[in-house]
Amino acid sequence: MKKVFIRTFGCQMNEYDSDKMLAVLAEEHGGIEQVTQADEADIILFNTCSVREKAQEKVFSDLGRVRPLKEKNPGLIIGVAGCVASQEGENIIKRAPYVDVVFGPQTLHRLPKMIVDKETSGLSQVDISFPEIEKFDHLPPARVEGGAAFVSIMEGCSKYCSFCVVPYTRGEEFSRPLNDVLTEIANLAQQGVKEINLLGQNVNAYRGEMDDGEICDFATLLRIVHEIPGIERMRFTTSHPREFTDSIIECYRDLPKLVSHLHLPIQSGSDRVLSAMKRGYTALEYKSIIRKLRAIRPDLCLSSDFIVGFPGETEREFEQTLKLVKDIAFDLSFVFIYSPRPGTPAANLHDDTPHEEKVRRLEALNEVIEAETARINQTMIGTVQRCLVEGISKKDPDQLQARTANNRVVNFTGTPDMINQMIDLEITEAYTFSLRGKVVEA
């Protein structure tokens, strides 16, 4: 049985893709063993992220660490997948000639053949083409062990924000046919999955073809998934404010399975910066979406993405972002210092903000966001939360870990039969990034 080591960088889409790589290899070899140490593996895969320079360079650092393993065992297969593979292509082989296969997000289904071709020819294989939806037609049915699962409904992005490399590494937006998505979810539900997380670079741009040739939009998809037997909770990530329509907002009113947690990236509170980023909305338009959502779902927890130190961002513009964060009361969010990506329009902009100032802005924004997260956690003490038990706690092997609808981790004392089940927990303690609870007896 082939032993496979895989390291995943970046977003949930990459996590989904990594699972699919393991699945296609398992189908090819009649099963595989996933190992946690690279020196135990027959196949080593790095599923990469190119959103920030630091993540990209980390890949080449890791490749350097496994080079001695290749020298010791020439039959070892080393592969680079994901967005760095799409962006760098043949350059990866030039920089690290011991790499055997390089493939993009849209060609992961070709991995087994690429390995065979490498072993047959002795030549490194590179396939970073964009065959659109083809990959989904060649992936084996999903097999899961947990109570929650990702389902990719679309790939790519056509927004071309000035700072973002995704359209160049994952291609333009394309949606999976509706029936394909529903079949995958129904299959997962039959395996005991309780929670579905719909995935895409911009899920609210979903336009899936139906059997009759008509198009299903994202709001309609949510309503259909809501009725699939066995599915008790629904999430989605990531969405774009430009296409967060009233019909999607109304789903928060009508669909109780849709969780009270939303990740909706804004990036900046400055209209000038948003325009330079080519985001396609103003801060006021974003706030209008949130007002509508909270009017019909008052308990909604909102997380977001922010970039500080975008080229030309002034202190006043950063203060506008800080004010917006306080006004909206964002939950735990992701704040990044701007990282220029090759080939994007923003990479050509003049950047005169000192790094030390960017770090100060990062810390100031994180301080406000973490304070709000802690406040929300405190308000949950004494409440009873419906939670999905994910497994053994990462903090204490004698405890279990569950997740609330608003995306909080709860550690508690329970029994193994609770894993992958929905249970009620009373929250007893709150920390900055997690909660403690106890089982509510029926």
From Swiss-Prot:
Question: Where the protein is mainly located, per its record?
Answer: cytoplasm
Q: Which HAMAP family match?
A: tRNA_metthiotr_MiaB (MF_01864)
This chain's function reads: Catalyzes the methylthiolation of N6-(dimethylallyl)adenosine (i(6)A), leading to the formation of 2-methylthio-N6-(dimethylallyl)adenosine (ms(2)i(6)A) at position 37 in tRNAs that read codons beginning with uridine.
Q: Which reaction does it catalyse?
A: N(6)-dimethylallyladenosine(37) in tRNA + (sulfur carrier)-SH + AH2 + 2 S-adenosyl-L-methionine = 2-methylsulfanyl-N(6)-dimethylallyladenosine(37) in tRNA + (sulfur carrier)-H + 5'-deoxyadenosine + L-methionine + A + S-adenosyl-L-homocysteine + 2 H(+)
Which InterPro entries does the record cross-reference, listed alphabetically?
Elp3/MiaA/NifB-like_rSAM, Methylthiotransferase, Methylthiotransferase_CS, Methylthiotransferase_N, Methylthiotransferase_N_sf, MiaB_methiolase, rSAM, rSAM_horseshoe
Keyword check for Nucleus, yes or no. Answer: no
Gene Ontology cellular component?
Answer: cytosol
This entry's comment on the bound cofactor is: Binds 2 [4Fe-4S] clusters. One cluster is coordinated with 3 cysteines and an exchangeable S-adenosyl-L-methionine.
Q: Which UniProt keywords apply?
A: 4Fe-4S, Cytoplasm, Iron, Iron-sulfur, Metal-binding, S-adenosyl-L-methionine, Transferase, tRNA processing
Which residue range or ranges hold the TRAM domain?
Answer: 378-441
Q: What is its EC number?
A: 2.8.4.3
Which cofactors is this protein said to need?
[4Fe-4S] cluster
The UniProt similarity line reads: Belongs to the methylthiotransferase family. MiaB subfamily.
Localization, per the record, is: Cytoplasm
The name this protein goes by in its record: tRNA-2-methylthio-N(6)-dimethylallyladenosine synthase
Radical SAM core domain location: 143-375
Identify which top EC class this enzyme belongs to: transferase
- Any idea which GO molecular function terms this record carries? 4 iron, 4 sulfur cluster binding; metal ion binding; N6-isopentenyladenosine methylthiotransferase activity
Q: Where does [4Fe-4S] cluster 2 bind?
A: C157, C161, C164
The residues the record assigns to binding [4Fe-4S] cluster 1 are C11, C49, C83
Describe the subunit structure.
Monomer.
Instruction: Report the residue ranges that make up the MTTase N-terminal domain in this protein.
Output: 2-120
